[in-house]
Amino acid sequence: DHHFVLSANMHGGALVANYPFDGPNSGSYSASPDDDLFIHISLAYADAHPNMESGGFSNGITNGAQWYAIFGGMQDWNYIWEGDCDITLEQHEIKWPNSNQLPGLWNDHREPMLSYIEEVHDGIRGIVTDAETGEPIVANISIQGIDHDILPDPENGDYYRLLPAGTYTITAQAFGYLAQSETVTVPL
């Protein structure tokens, strides 16, 4: 019963890794608070693909709204409401490829999918509990400079937060407790 922290939607009709945000204006870049992270995980997929960078998008990735705006898309919803970093993987220029093309598509996307899944290990994790009772605390976990907080699992207090390599100040705060901050480094 843990929250997802990384997921992907798979579509056809283009060859690109598409990341949030998908709105508000079509043709305009719409950065999420975790824009650097979304670029990083999108590139992890695109760079492992044999020809995604030749799909008409710079480095094989695009910001959703910069490509075309939609509202109520899964990747934006997952990020905003669940803290799940979700991108849309457009896997082939043809929306409905012939069945005889599927083995080749699998071969093209197998390693990129594995590279993408490995990104789940980049970031931080921890457990927030009461020092005296050991009971989990539903604390707000914030990263200085990134306006997108997460909550730990209420049953055991654990949390996972994807972050690209860098140094971050993490703060946990909950009603009735003193806020606790730590500076951590996420390695390359």
Sequence positions of predicted segments:
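Structured interaction patches on ligand/partner-binding surfaces of diverse proteins
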Residues: 175-188
